[in-house]
Amino acid sequence: MKIIQIERIIDAGNFPQSHDWRKIERDIFQAIQSIEWPPGSGSFTLFDEPGKRRGQGSGVKPIKRACMQTLEALGWQLETSIGIATDRRPGPMDATYKIKDRLFCVEWETGNISSSHRSVNKMALGILKKILIGGALILPTRKMYRYLTDRVGNFPELAPYFPLWKSLDVDEGLLLIIAIEHDAISDKVPRIKKGTDGRALQ
């Protein structure tokens, strides 16, 4: 799988130049770029079928699980509950890595564009509250999203709001939006079904 674009929404203080960040960056890149389909192919090829209708396109959550399993193998904690923006039971972050008394989190978008906004808002607020040292939201390009089953949030839809988040006054932290994309499209590969185990993608 390819990383197409990385947008730094928050880039403040010493953390973005630290050894801790370089380790986290390597982990994230490895987790994304190691995702394969079909298994053992050495690349990520989506079935040539737009996901406009029910039952069509490739599943989103199995692709996410493949990334998360790699992060877990690299020492990350999965499904970490963090009370940032709610007084009720907080929803878990997909993956977190502890840096001293703060966390760096990774979210892989499987919902719609509203979900993408919530994820960025939650991570930005976590940085402002000094609960998080940073975060990264991973989501598809528009080119990739058209082959996925759900109307998942995508990079171009979120981009008009980048100036809003970039205007935040933060003294320490790093917040990234990472756009990913398939290596190829083919009608010779299987469709990734919604119920496919993430391990099958590695």
Predicted regions mapped to residue ranges:
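Conserved beta-strand signature within the Rossmann-like core of class I S-adenosyl-L-methionine
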Residues: 131-141
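Active-site metal-binding core of divalent-cation-utilizing nuclease and nuclease-like domains
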Residues: 53-58, 62-101, 112-121, 128
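Short beta-strand-loop-alpha-helix junction that forms the active-site gateway
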Residues: 107-120, 142-144, 148
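Interdomain/boundary linker segments immediately adjacent to catalytic/signaling cores
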Residues: 1-82
